[in-house]
Curated annotation (Swiss-Prot):
In the N-terminal section; belongs to the methyltransferase superfamily. tRNA (mnm(5)s(2)U34)-methyltransferase family. In the C-terminal section; belongs to the DAO family. NCBIfam families: MnmC_Cterm (TIGR03197), PRK01747.1-2 (NF002481), tRNA_MNMC2 (NF033855). This is tRNA 5-methylaminomethyl-2-thiouridine biosynthesis bifunctional protein MnmC. Keywords: Cytoplasm, FAD, Flavoprotein, Methyltransferase, Multifunctional enzyme, Oxidoreductase, S-adenosyl-L-methionine, Transferase, tRNA processing. The keyword Calcium does not apply. Its main location: cytoplasm. It comes from Campylobacter jejuni subsp. jejuni serotype O:23/36 (strain 81-176). It is found in: Cytoplasm. Residues 252-613 are annotated as: FAD-dependent cmnm(5)s(2)U34 oxidoreductase.
């Protein structure tokens, strides 16, 4: 990612990349208020979305958030979503220094320090920050990334240096995407009154009004007169906006994917009931004593690898923001030539500090799954029903009625979510969706190696906790036994041989078996259940029509999937939960389209139809 080149000129940040000031050198604070943050009225609605081209030093955001928090709750939206795109990265310490030099630091100190505490490294991606009743999605990408995003803004801040210095931020391609991501009466706020900007706004349906700008300057405001009719060549992956009869949600399964989802839903005011077939938490794969938060290391530009990296860093940031966890890092070792080749291609990646055959992932570390899942459920205030083995559902009058073993019935749920991990295989019956159930066994040893962070190679070693050290894990697609096996313990020990002296005597004090859920392409399966009959009929000619506009997809009901997280569910569950909340609650989707397509439940069927099969 490009780093911003800036200096101070006239006591104001000045961009060497664009030969322009970040904002008015005379009175930038009041100009930002006049042009952007105080130029519209709040609406008393569920979600209010502000989108911005050019985050800069974040001044517009902090002014907006401060105004939002100072407004009486009954006179503002329930939730503020703020999406800002920035192509030029400013270092954390430099941002703090800028606010101090400008004399803004004390005014924004509390919000700024909360932001800087979880500020990511200089790497492209969408990074979420949690504030009171507000989500900030900071998008570190070129502005062209807008074509990958999906939301309908109430307000747009078109910022980003003078148009004659940065024309890309105001050209026709950008304004088309701005219009696509807007709804009727969306307001455009901008300091510019450039004629070509006005022309582009009018071209895509905005009513443009000239108005007095800050001090003697002239500026414009624009309003979208009618929402664009936008047809998509990949409409089979598009969202369908949901309508809910109530805010009751049922989640089947009580593992990590369910726990993160329950917490995220609770932030939006949903009442969550969780149904678990076991008698307590921690009986499945999410119940190990210790585990590792880490990332796959694949070659650059590999979709699965990039998604794993984003999932990893966002999970790390989530656990630090929400649970105040502290991570000391994790060391990954290249244990064969293929792994070493991957390491060699990732030496410039800021997530991986690679030296020879080792990669240190600073944001990773040891996790304690049982405690983590328990804490998230407690924060969510979800009601967990143990000893409830799900059997079937009935959907009528826009609500679900659930049937459990022993003739137990629960009803009146607007949303049903499958998050039962490996057991999902018994409840999803799409022909093209191939799921596998993989057995894994971890071994509990008496402490034998003093390490502050996990070590991962053929197998992994966790730091000592409660006089116990966890190693693992085995991998078996064919074995379905719940019983621990001596040969698996032996294999786990053999796989950590590189970390211990051959004369070291290891004492096994226990084992635990769990089952992982995998898809055939290793991506998780997350999204709305789809209408298979509709898909097979409507998209049957995709072999010949895949480059033409498609009819919008049809979903079956408010049934959602959240499974096939494999062995990295503690990473992927965070993005899964945010994405599902966005679908259920009609929020901005927090993922780029390339990732949405990769995790969509219908992807296997679409691939088949594109081949004419």
């Amino acid at each position: 990612m490009k780093k911003a080149k800036l200096i101070f000129k006239d006591n104001t940040p000045f961009s060497l990349d664009f030969d322009d000031f970040y904002f008015n050198s005379k009175d930038g604070l009041n100009e930002s208020k006049f042009v952007y943050t105080h130029s519209f009225e709040w609406k008393n609605q569920e979600n209010f979305i502000i989108a911005e081209s050019g985050f800069g030093i974040g001044l517009n955001f902090f002014l907006t958030l401060k105004r939002f928090l100072q407004t009486t709750p009954s006179k503002r939206p329930k939730k503020l979503f703020y999406i800002s795109v920035e192509a030029f990265y400013i270092e954390k310490e430099q941002l703090r220094e800028i606010y101090q030099k400008l004399g803004f630091y004390e005014e924004f100190k509390e919000l700024l320090e909360q932001f800087l505490k979880f500020y990511p490294k200089a790497k492209e991606g969408i990074y979420r920050f949690y504030f009171e009743d507000c989500f900030l999605d900071l998008v570190f990408e070129d502005i062209a990334v807008l074509k990958e995003l999906d939301f309908k803004a109430d307000i747009w801040y078109l910022d980003g240096f003078s148009p004659n210095k940065n024309s890309q931020m105001f050209d026709g391609n950008l304004i088309f995407e701005v219009a696509r991501l807007s709804k009727k009466n969306t307001q455009i706020c901008t300091f510019s009154s450039a004629s070509f900007l006005q022309k582009n706004l009018k071209k895509y349906g905005f009513r443009v009004e000239k108005t007095k700008g800050f001090r003697k300057r002239e500026m414009i405001k624009a309003y979208l007169e009618n929402e664009l009719e936008f047809k998509d060549k990949e409409a089979y992956f598009s969202r369908t906006f949901s309508s809910l009869k109530n805010k009751k949600v049922a989640i089947i399964g009580a593992g990590i994917s369910s726990a993160v989802l329950a917490y995220e839903l609770s932030l939006r005011g949903f009442k969550i009931d969780v149904f678990e077939k076991h008698l307590e938490l921690g009986k499945g794969a999410s119940g190990n004593e210790s585990g590792i938060l880490s990332s796959l290391i694949l070659k650059p530009k590999v979709n699965l690898g990039e998604f794993s990296e984003l999932s990893f860093i966002e999970a790390s940031r989530f656990y630090r923001q929400i649970l105040d966890l502290k991570f000391k890092g994790v060391v990954e070792f290249a244990h064969n030539d293929l792994m070493q080749e991957r390491f060699d291609t990732q030496r410039e990646n800021v997530l991986f500090k690679i030296s020879k055959n080792q990669a240190f992932l600073e944001e990773g570390g040891v996790i304690f799954p049982k405690n983590l899942v328990k804490n998230l459920f407690e924060k969510s205030k979800a009601c967990i029903y143990f000893n409830h083995e799900f059997q079937a559902y009935k959907f009528e009058n826009e609500c679900f009625t659930l049937k459990f073993k022993n003739d137990i019935v629960k009803s009146d749920y607007a949303v049903l979510i499958y998050a039962m991990g490996a057991d999902t295989k018994d409840f999803v019956f799409y022909d093209e969706m191939k799921l596998s159930k993989v057995r894994g066994q971890v071994t509990h040893l008496k402490p034998f190696l003093n390490t502050p962070f996990p070590l991962s190679s053929k197998a992994y070693i966790c730091p000592v906790k409660d006089d116990l050290q966890v190693i693992g894990a085995s991998y078996d697609r064919l074995d379905t036994s719940l019983e621990s096996k001596e040969e698996d313990d032996k294999q786990n020990i053999e796989n950590i041989a590189e970390f211990i002296d051959k004369n070291t005597k290891l004492e096994i004090i226990g084992s635990k078996v769990g089952f992982r859920s995998y898809s055939s392409d290793r991506f998780m399966i997350v999204g709305n259940a789809y209408d298979e009959v509709f898909y097979k009929e409507e998209y049957k000619a995709l072999l010949w029509t895949k480059n033409k506009e498609q009819k919008l997809a049809k979903m079956s009901c408010n049934l959602y999937f959240n499974f096939a997280h494999g062995s990295r569910g503690f990473s992927t569950s965070v993005l899964a939960a945010r994405y599902l909340c966005a679908l259920i609650n009609n929020e901005p989707l927090c993922l780029e389209k390339k990732y949405i397509h990769a995790i969509h439940p219908a992807r296997f069927l679409i691939r088949k139809l594109k081949k004419g099969l």
